[in-house]
Structures are given as C-alpha cells and as structure tokens.
Amino acid sequence: MEKNIAHCPVEGNGEIENGASSSQNPESLEHSVLLSTSQTMPNNLGIRKNYKRAANRGKKGSQGLTGQAYTLMSSNSDVRVLRSTSSSKTTSTEHVQAPVQPAAKRRKMSRASNKSSTDEFSQIRKRVRYILNRMNYEQSLIEAYASEGWKNQSLDKIRPEKELERAKSEILRCKLRIREVFRNIDSLLSKGKIDETLFDSEGEISCEDIFCSTCGSNDATLGNDIILCDGACDRGFHQNCLNPPLRTEDIPMGDEGWLCPACDCKIDCIDLINELHGSNISIEDSWEKVFPDAAAMANDSKQDDAFDLPSDDSDDNDFDPNMPEEHVVGKDEESSEEDEDGGSDSDDSDFLTCSDDSEPLIDKKVDDLRLPSEDSEDDDYDPAGPDSDKDVEKKSSSDESDFTSDSDDFCKEISKSGHDEVSSPLLPDAKVGDMEKITAQAKTTSSADDPMETEIDQGVVLPDSRRRQAERLDYKKLYDEAYGEASSDSSDDEEWSGKNTPIIKSNEEGEANSPAGKGSRVVHHNDELTTQSTKKSLHSIHGSVDEKPGDLTSNGSNSTARKGHFGPVINQKLHEHFKTQPYPSRSVKESLAEELGLTFRQVNKWFETRRHSARVASSRKGISLDKHSPQNTNSQVTASMEPKEPEGTVVEESNVCLNGGTTISKEAVSSKVGSRTPGSDVGGSKVDSAEDQNPGPDLAEKARQKAIQQELRKKKMGR
C-alpha cells in the first residue's frame, strides 16, 4: 500500500492522457497529491519503528544498486516522453513546460554529486588494487631467485642482492600505504556515527535517536526515510542523501542487511587482501590489524636511526653546567695529547728533514693556544694562579724529550766527533779564502746555539723551551745508521759526497782533467795557509790521517766503516782489536760499545765491513801478484794510488809494502792540471814503456770507476 501511495504522482498519468483535464486543472492535481502524502505520514512512522538491525551483519545487500540506478533515469525519460505527447495534443504548452524545467535542473545536480561520490570510493578501490598488484610483482621477483629450481639449477644464478633488497623495501612501503588507505576509510566511517549506548541488548534503537549522518536531520518522509547501515559504522542515511539515492523498493526486506557506500568500499578492499595474501580480516576490524608486521618493522628501523643520535638529556654524568669553559678546553687538549702521542715519532722524523734554508718557526700566540688571557681587567684573572707560560714550556720540553730520546745515538756521535756536520764538506781544491769565510760563518751560526753546544759537549742533552733550529745533517750517515752501510770495493764509493762527483768527458784532455783520484792518502804540510777546517774536510774525504801506514791495503782503498766517522781514538782502538781478534764474540762487542760510547749495531757493522774490505784486498792482491812482476806492480800501484792535486801542494806518498821489503817513497810537486810526473800519471794516461806494454791496471781501473758510477746511481735511485 505504501509503494502505491509513493507512486501516486506517477499513476496520475491517466489523467494526463485526457489533455484538457490535465491542462485545465493542474492545481487540483497537485492538491490531491499533497492530501494523499499527508494522509500516509502516520503510517510511515509506524514502518520506521519496525526497522531492526539485521542479525547477519556484513552481508552486502546492495549488489544491484549500480544497475538499478538507471531505472530512475528511465522514469525521468518517461516523463520527458509524456511531456512531448501532451504538448502535441494541446495547442497551449505554457502549462506543461512550467513544472518540468525544475526537474531537469535537479537531474543535472544529482549527476554531479553522484560522480563525485562514486569517484571518491572508486579511487580508493583502484588505489588498493594497484598497490596489491605492485606487491605481487615484487614478491614474484623475490620468489624467482629464492626457489631452487629443477635439480637445484637455480642455485647457480647470480643473485641481484641490491635489487632483492629494493624489492623487499618496496613491499614494506606498499603495506604501509595500504594501512594508510584503511586508516582513511575508518576516518570516513567515524563521521556521523551513532553512539552505541543508544542501542539496546537486541540491537534496536528508538526512532527519536536516529539521525542522518549526511545532513544531521532526524526528519523522515514516506519517500525519504532514514535507513541504518548494517556494517561497522552504525550510521543512518536519508534515502535521498545517499549518492545515488536509494529507492524504497530497493531496500532489502527481512534479515538481509544493507551497507553504506563507505562500508561497501571497505569490504571490497578486505576481500582483495584476503584473496591475495590469505589473511582473515573482517569488516569490524580496525586499520591497525591490517599488516601489523609491516608497522613493527617500520618502528624498528626508526628506533635504530634514533639510537645513532646523541642524547640531549641534561642529566648526563659528564655534564657540569657550573664548569667554566677554560676547563672544558683543557680537557679537550689533554684528550688530544693522548691521541697525538702515537704520532710524535713520525712528527719528529719529519722535523729532522728540515733544511738550513728554512726560516725559524714563529711561536704561537696565546690566543692560538687557547690559553686564558693575563689581562688584569678580565674577570677570570687570578694573579696568584699558575703561570700558563710555564705550562707551555713544560709541554714543549716533554715534546723535545721525546725528540731527543729518538736521537740519543746521533747526539753521542756529535759529541765524539765535534761539530763537523755544521759545515758542508769542502773540496780539496777549494781556495783558502773561501774556506776561512765558511769557517767564520759556521762559528757565527754555532755561537747562536751556545746552550745546546755546551750540553752536547757534556754528553747530556737537556730539553729546551723553544723550538730547535735545524742544522745541516749528513743524510748519508743517517741512512747508513738506519739501513746499514752497503759494502763496496772502492773507497770512493764510501767517501762520496754530492760535490765531488766525477765529470766524464769524451776526449783525452777531459780524461786527464777528471777529478777521480786513484785512492792514495794526501797529507798537506809545510803550508802555513792551510787551516784546521781544510784538514777536517780532507780528513772526512780521504780518511784518517793518524792511521798507520801498514793498515793500507794493496789497492789503496779505505773500505772500513767510513774512516774518521767515530774519531781517530775510536778508530785506533777498533783497529787494535781487529788485529788481535777479527771475529770477536758478542760480549767483546758489547764491552767495546760500552767503552767507546757506541751502540752494539755500530761496532758489529764496523767489524763486518772491515773483514769484507780485508777479503777484497787480499783477493785483488793475489790477482795483481799473478799477472805482473814485482817491479811493474810497484810502479803501477803507485801510479794508481796518486790522485789529482791542486796547484802548489806538496804530495807525500805513504810507504806501501807489497813484496817483502820493496818500498817506494818520493816527493813530487804537482804542476798544472794535465801535466805528467815521473812514475805516475794524474789523469790516467800512460807514461812509461812498462805501462804501455802492460795496460791491465788501466783497464781494471776504468772498470772499477764504471762500477763505482753504477753503484752511485743505484743508491741515488734507492733514496
């Protein structure tokens, strides 16, 4: 009966067919419709009270709502058709067009609202479906490399580890996005929700407490009644407030439930998740139950990131708000000193490599050292407090003590041999005036370091508060101390310096002018202009002057551990021990080292090189005795031992014992460079017929010079 009453305006189409009655009395038709609706209002209230919530919640009762929405449009099209037929039968169309135009406007507005509402929930469905497809794609990639395959053939595949990690992170991100979608749906369902306390134990609610969640009104009419959702939202909606509007005949009857569009969208998304992932999510579950494992993993990753950050808690044990900033700086400097202790040795070694040309280092200012200022106007000034300059001196003295502890052996050698390392070695042909100038400069430079020199003379090196100025060092000596001396067959190799390298020329005059000596020892005497510095330079180049003549070998080479390196007294004692015992025991070496102020390594190396030179000398002596007669040998050795001398110097050759009692001793005054002396050739050219007939020593000397040059090149490249 209600449906007939609701469709009473539609049944009036029979009156419209008459044409005249419908056109002449339109007001009477509208009046009759209003009377019929007013009479059915009490009946609608009774029907509203009889609505109960369905027992079987969760069932979708609006499966065909989308398809039935077109029936309403067809009814409107019928109205349009009826309007056209009535206008064709009657000549006046003014009364027919008046009530039809508002219906067209309402139809356009309903289309726009219908499109927006359906788009909102349809976009949610599409979004969830897209995210699930993305998850399936990434999961298939992981499973493709996780499976072993037929006969474990898939184990041989190259696994893209980075790609698999990216896939896992993408799956986690997709799960979090789905959780956000369900959270959005739950927020939509919470709008306009009826309080659960208004429902009784049977699930019924009074009609006075029901209101529309869209418009908020509790008024209901016959064709626009309020219907409750049987989902999880517990909300009510007017039939016309829904999008699309719900017709009365589409309302499910009996125990069949009805779902609002939001609950319908939620249950569709839940069905997709349950189908693809095998989960068991219901419509009454909240969004927190959707992929809870993904949320836990995300929280763990956030906590791990938070653990790496320093704490901002002011209750830390090492925090003292009353501590002044100066003490904090002092603690930082102490901690930095401990870290720098390990690298002090390397810093000291870098300091040793400084040259004399480098300017002295400028002391740091007080501000650079982060020390408190001593201004009396400062608030933190304490005249009775400790002096900061003394602390700096103590700190620098500790650094210097570390430096001196690494170079104790070096300082002992300086105290034994004097200050020979201050000035560079001089050439034998240098002028006397130049040597005096260099000696004066050395004295002036050494006078600036009087405190340090006195300490070195005493054999004790005390720390100094200021920076030490770098002196010229003998790097070859330092290299030999660190890596040991390389034994060679010639004294020129051991006594080599960077200023007396031989110059090789192609012509005979260049060979005559070559400064490469033949190994004899030179002593300058009866010359009043010769200074003590010249003797020291010749002493450092050609060996010890005080050594006995009998200590020379047949080839005139000083192949011991750098003659004059330890001083004449130490060398004399070492030679005496070597004559008595060439192979001393370890205890004897230790006693010698303790007695002479040397290290065990230096003493051991000296004996090794001395034995090697003795073996080489004996082997060469045997070769020369076999090939040459005694007379030729004496003349040849004497010629090979005589070096090139500067003009005006007197040369005295040492007595060389080769064949029993045969000795040669003579004096010669060297003339201009390239002149020949009787019995000897300065440039290496032949003089007498014996040497013309026996060119063996000259060839041997050339080969020896060539070997020396090759060895020097190797040492230069090795450094």
Swiss-Prot record:
Basic and acidic residues composition-biased segments: 324-333, 361-373, 387-398, 409-422, 464-480
Biased composition annotated in UniProt, kind: Low complexity: 84-93
Localization terms from the record: Nucleus
Source species taxonomy: Eukaryota, Viridiplantae, Streptophyta, Embryophyta, Tracheophyta
Organism: Zea mays
Gene3D superfamilies: Homeodomain-like, Zinc/RING finger domain, C3HC4 (zinc finger)
Recorded coiled-coil stretches: none
Protein name in UniProt: Homeobox protein HOX1A
MF-aspect GO terms: chromatin binding; DNA binding; DNA-binding transcription factor activity, RNA polymerase II-specific; zinc ion binding
Stored InterPro entries: HD (IPR001356), Homeobox_CS (IPR017970), Homeodomain-like_sf (IPR009057), PRHA-like_PHD-finger (IPR045876), Zinc_finger_PHD-type_CS (IPR019786), Znf_FYVE_PHD (IPR011011), Znf_PHD (IPR001965), Znf_PHD-finger (IPR019787)
